[in-house]
Amino acid sequence: MERQNQSCVVEFILLGFSNYPELQGQLFVAFLVIYLVTLIGNAIIIVIVSLDQSLHVPMYLFLLNLSVVDLSFSAVIMPEMLVVLSTEKTTISFGGCFAQMYFILLFGGAECFLLGAMAYDRFAAICHPLNYQMIMNKGVFMKLIIFSWALGFMLGTVQTSWVSSFPFCGLNEINHISCETPAVLELACADTFLFEIYAFTGTFLIILVPFLLILLSYIRVLFAILKMPSTTGRQKAFSTCAAHLTSVTLFYGTASMTYLQPKSGYSPETKKVMSLSYSLLTPLLNLLIYSLRNSEMKRALMKLWRRRVVLHTI
C-alpha cells in the first residue's frame, strides 16, 4: 500500500504561515530565538545532571529525561518550520513527512506520561516525606521512565503505520507547520472513521488520564502546603505549583484539542497556534519552570561554571 501511496504522492508541501507573508520575517526571528534558547538550555540541563553526582536522584533524573524529550521534540519540528518561514514554498518527501510524524508522536507521547510521573514524584516527596525513599525507589523510577519511552515508541509506531497505509492521491498541500497526524489525515483518499475512533480513545488515555492524575496529585500537594507553618514557604510552594500547572495545562489542553478529533472544525490558523503552544512554548516553559527556577539546579550550574573557569586559568 505504501508503494502505491508514493506513486501517487511522492512529496508534500508544507504551507506554514504562507497566508501572512508580511509576518514571516518576524516570526522566523522570534521562533529561531526561542528554539535556540530551548536547545541550548536543555542541553545544559542534560550536561549538569549527568555530571553532578548529587543530582542523581529521581527528581533531577526526571528533569534530565524531560530535557531530552523537549530538546528532541523541538529539534523534530522547529528546523523544518524555520525552513517553511524562510521560503515561499517548501516540500518534504513522503518518507520524510512520516518520519517527522513518527518522532512527534514518540516524543509527545513520552512527555505526556513523563509529566504525570514527575507530578507523582512531587506528590510522594511532599505528602509522604518519611516514606518517599520507599515509594520512589530505583525500581519504581526505572519502571516509570521505561514506560514513558515505551508509550512514545508504541504510539509513534502504531499511529504512523496506520496513517501511512492510507492512499494519498489528491492534493499534497499540508496547511500546517509540520507533518502532524491531523493535518496529514485531511489529505487521505479513504474512509478514516475507524482511525478517528482509535485517535479519540488513544488521546483520552494518553493525554487526559495523565492530566487528571496530575491535577489530583497537585490538589493533594496544595492541601499539604496549606499545613506549612511558614508563610514564606507556603507562598513559594504555591508559586511553584501554579507555574507547573500552567505549563501542563497549556501542553495537555492544546494537545487534546488537536488530537481528540483529528478532523475537527477548528480553522487551519487555530490549529497552527495550538501546535505552536505544545511544540514551541511548552518546551521553553518547562525549561524555565522546572529547571532554571530550581535552586539546586542553579547551584550545580554555578559549580560547573566555576570548574570551567578554573580549568581555563590553569
From Swiss-Prot:
GO CC terms of this entry: plasma membrane
Main location: membrane
UniProt topological domain (Extracellular) ranges: 1-25, 76-99, 161-197, 259-271
Topology term for the membrane: Multi-pass membrane protein
Glycosylation sites: 5
SUPFAM superfamilies, alphabetized: Family A G protein-coupled receptor-like
Transmembrane segments: 26-46, 55-75, 100-120, 140-160, 198-217, 238-258, 272-292
A single GO molecular function term of this UniProt record: olfactory receptor activity
Domain of life: Eukaryota
GO biological process: detection of chemical stimulus involved in sensory perception of smell
Pfam families in UniProt: 7tm_4
Keyword vocabulary terms for this entry: Cell membrane, Disulfide bond, G-protein coupled receptor, Glycoprotein, Membrane, Olfaction, Receptor, Sensory transduction, Transducer, Transmembrane, Transmembrane helix
InterPro entries in UniProt: GPCR_Rhodpsn, GPCR_Rhodpsn_7TM, Olfact_rcpt
CDD domains referenced in this protein's UniProt entry, alphabetically: 7tmA_OR10A-like
The keyword Transmembrane helix is annotated on this UniProt entry: yes
Disulfide bonds listed in the record: 97-189
Keyword Cell membrane annotated: yes
Function as written in the Swiss-Prot or TrEMBL entry: Odorant receptor.
PANTHER family on file: OLFACTORY RECEPTOR (PTHR26453)
Record-stated family: Belongs to the G-protein coupled receptor 1 family.
Name of this protein: Olfactory receptor 10A6
